């Protein structure tokens, strides 16, 4: 149905080219039915590039979806541009401070060859999962 994205979102044209309706948060607030807020903890390498792969199926839903991009305090995002993270992604506490999340998507890639509990940001991920 519809994806709620900020103005000038980098993948807006691509989403529209694939038949996804895009609205700004201001436009979405005027709708009769509220958006569902889906927290997306995207720890994939090159997060910016991977966002379309998440938004496209969400945009095919019968519901209006507002993605809430979440970043970790304890993870270094080496392969994603810092301005993109700072402009679009929020820390988990900020994501839930204004309004609860209706769902959570957790993405990642097995780029390290160590057990989960040894990954430096694992405790923070567990806190977010506990919330969900």
Annotate each language-model stretch with its function.
Residues 128-132:
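Catalytic nucleophile loop
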Residues 2-117, 121-126:
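N-terminal beta1-alpha1 cap of cysteine-dependent amidohydrolase-like domains
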